[in-house]
Amino acid sequence: MTESKRILADVLLRPVITEKATALMEQRKYVFEVLPTATKPLIRAAVEEMFRVRVTSVNTLKPPRKQRRVGRFVGYRTRPKRAIVTLAEGDSITLFPDT
């Protein structure tokens, strides 16, 4: 595996499996947690390389951090950056293999 392919493989952390994300799959939109430093072109290249599909658009979002309190001390828990990837007509990603 070359260095560039290894970097692309590290960009996508995991797919997001929620009710909303599952409903988006019917519209050829897939949600992934990505590295906080990942850019849209890098996410597009990673999805196209790993799943052999054509990506039409990439939307990213970074949810606000959550406040956590332990006694009198206040801290924050960061939330992971997410990418919503829209695929071209006729392409799909199999996240749940048939058993």
From Swiss-Prot:
Assembly with partners or alone: Part of the 50S ribosomal subunit. Contacts protein L29, and trigger factor when it is bound to the ribosome.
GO cellular component, one term: ribosome
Protein name in the entry: Large ribosomal subunit protein uL23
Gene name as annotated: rplW
Keyword Hydrolase (UniProt): no
Family indicated by similarity: Belongs to the universal ribosomal protein uL23 family.
Role: One of the early assembly proteins it binds 23S rRNA. One of the proteins that surrounds the polypeptide exit tunnel on the outside of the ribosome. Forms the main docking site for trigger factor binding to the ribosome.
NCBIfam families for the chain: PRK05738.2-4, PRK05738.3-4
GO BP: translation
Record GO terms (molecular function): rRNA binding; structural constituent of ribosome
Keyword line: Ribonucleoprotein, Ribosomal protein, RNA-binding, rRNA-binding
